[in-house]
């Protein structure tokens, strides 16, 4: 187990640790930091302007063999965000600011006065206080410089006016007229849009009214057709009903005639028979036949008066036979 885990190692007796070669570990000379630009700069490679306060992942190192009153000076390596060119800036503890070292130039800041400019201004003021002639000369030089600057500005304006065919006042008037025309056109477009919207709304309302009227007309026409069809069906039913009534009346009349004929035959048979036993059976047979015929054929209600006459005649004939 000990050999497998290599817990204990064997050192020979002639081992000299001083002779063992030391492994050089490469350590990073830079430290990565996230910084913000303390000033606005311009890239010399692509001309991109980088504003103050832009964040960068920079590499920081200490400048060798360079310090100010024992204060270390640091160098920062940056990358341009557009062309990825390397930019370097250094700390300046003497003036309490930063300096562009390579890859970029610092933008001009008129509110910031360097120490050299400040020292020159102080010496100039002291000289003017000591000697009035020097002060007078300096004032004349400053006035002369101002006059030269004004002349240069006037020349530039005259050149621009010659090159330009349109006067500034005319240009302003043209811009005002153009703006008024655009506003007028916009107002007209808005009015047309509003009118079109309202016209479409009115058209839709009219179409809806027409559709409703057409639907109502269709419904009324369908109702009229149904009523006419119902009237036709009623006429047909009435005609059929009247025909059925006529047929029923004819059938009833035929039945009445048949019953009357049967009754007359039964009565004639009873009168013609003689008082013998054989004739009784024949009379009974005829009577049975008459009764059967009455059950098979329905008797109408209108002939109730004829039925008791036939039955009474039948019973009287039967009683006469029994007495005999």
From Swiss-Prot:
One of its GO terms (molecular function) is metal ion binding. It is found in: Nucleus. Keywords: Metal-binding, mRNA processing, mRNA splicing, Nucleus, Spliceosome, Zinc. The keyword rRNA-binding does not apply. Zn(2+) binds at residues 43, 46, 80, 83. GO terms for cellular component: U2-type catalytic step 1 spliceosome. Residues 302-316 have a biased composition (Low complexity). Residues 294-324 are annotated as: Disordered. Coiled coil: none annotated. The keyword Cytoplasm does not apply. It holds the Pfam family Saf4_Yju2. Its main location: nucleus. InterPro entries: Saf4/Yju2 (IPR007590), Yju2 (IPR043701). GO terms for biological process: generation of catalytic spliceosome for first transesterification step; negative regulation of DNA damage response, signal transduction by p53 class mediator; RNA splicing. Part of the spliceosome which catalyzes two sequential transesterification reactions, first the excision of the non-coding intron from pre-mRNA and then the ligation of the coding exons to form the mature mRNA. Plays a role in stabilizing the structure of the spliceosome catalytic core and docking of the branch helix into the active site, producing 5'-exon and lariat intron-3'-intermediates. Component of the spliceosome. Present in the activated B complex, the catalytically activated B* complex which catalyzes the branching, the catalytic step 1 C complex catalyzing the exon ligation, and the postcatalytic P complex containing the ligated exons (mRNA) and the excised lariat intron. Belongs to the CWC16 family. YJU2 subfamily. This is Splicing factor YJU2. The gene is yju2.
């Amino acid at each position: 187990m000990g050999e497998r885990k290599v817990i204990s190692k064997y050192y020979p007796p002639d081992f000299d640790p001083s002779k063992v070669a030391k492994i050089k570990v490469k350590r990073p000379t830079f430290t990565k930091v996230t910084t913000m630009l303390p000033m606005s700069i311009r890239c010399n490679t692509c001309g991109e302007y980088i504003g103050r306060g832009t964040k960068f992942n920079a590499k920081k190192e200490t400048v060798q063999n360079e310090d100010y009153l024992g204060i270390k000076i640091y160098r920062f390596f940056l990358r341009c965000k557009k062309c990825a060119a390397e930019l370097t800036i250094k700390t300046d503890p003497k003036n309490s600011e930063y300096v562009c070292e390579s890859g970029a130039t610092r933008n001009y800041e008129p509110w910031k006065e360097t120490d050299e400019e400040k020292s020159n201004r102080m010496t100039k003021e002291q000289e003017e206080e000591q000697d009035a002639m020097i002060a007078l000369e300096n004032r004349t030089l400053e006035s002369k410089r101002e006059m030269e600057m004004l002349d240069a500005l006037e020349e530039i304006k005259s050149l621009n006016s010659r090159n330009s065919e349109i006067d500034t006042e005319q240009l302003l008037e043209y811009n005002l007229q153009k703006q008024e025309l655009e506003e007028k056109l916009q107002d007209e477009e808005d009015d047309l849009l509003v009118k079109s919207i309202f016209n479409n709304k009115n058209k839709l309302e009219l179409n809806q009214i027409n559709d409703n009227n057409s639907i109502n007309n269709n419904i009324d026409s369908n109702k009229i057709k149904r009523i006419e069809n119902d009237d036709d069906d009623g006429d047909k039913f009435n005609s059929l009903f009247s025909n059925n009534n006529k047929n029923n009346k004819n059938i009833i009349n035929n039945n009445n005639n048949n019953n009357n004929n049967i009754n007359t035959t039964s009565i004639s048979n009873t009168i013609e028979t003689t008082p013998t036993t054989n004739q009784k059976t024949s009379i009974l047979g005829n009577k049975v036949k008459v009764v059967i015929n009455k059950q098979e054929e329905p008797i109408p209600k209108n002939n109730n008066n004829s039925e008791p006459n036939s039955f009474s005649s039948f019973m009287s004939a039967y009683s006469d036979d029994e007495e005999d």
